[in-house]
Amino acid sequence: MPTRKLIAEVVAATLARTRSYFEEEFAIGVADVSQDRGDIDMLDIHDLTAIVGVGGPVNLLVAFSFEQRLVDTLFQRMTADIDVPAGEEDVYRSAAAAEIVNTIIGNCTSDFQQQDRGIALTPPVILNKAKHLQRMKNAVFVSRTLNTEFGCVDINLVGPTELFDDSLNYVK
């Protein structure tokens, strides 16, 4: 499968898997998906962001940036049956976000797995209270926002510019 087609599949799989995971595991419906992509220098991010590297036929960074209210709701639902020690809420909240992203991206691998090539994933890296991600040289941000009643999550892919045309569409 060409690399450019694989990127389009990564985007589609990530959106579909995020939507289904939110609905099935947390009973949180995704109202709509908005699109924002481009050759911007700085990406504004929300209160908690989890970044995973996807390697193999295509190398991308995938950053899930959660609004505080949404990550709080996810955290509460994930830890409902756990005694969270006082003062450890932020640690557990970050761990919950990392687990959510890890599960979503892990589930995505079956959607774009090639028989002859493996797919490598990095563990999630958590950014708390960061405000921006600086664009790397020769990279493009492709962003989608999933809106829920509890806030939104931005899903940002960071990939090399040669995979996109001058209008920042995937080159197939």
Put a short name on every predicted segment.
Residues 1-172:
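N-terminal auxiliary interaction/assembly segments of multi-subunit proteins
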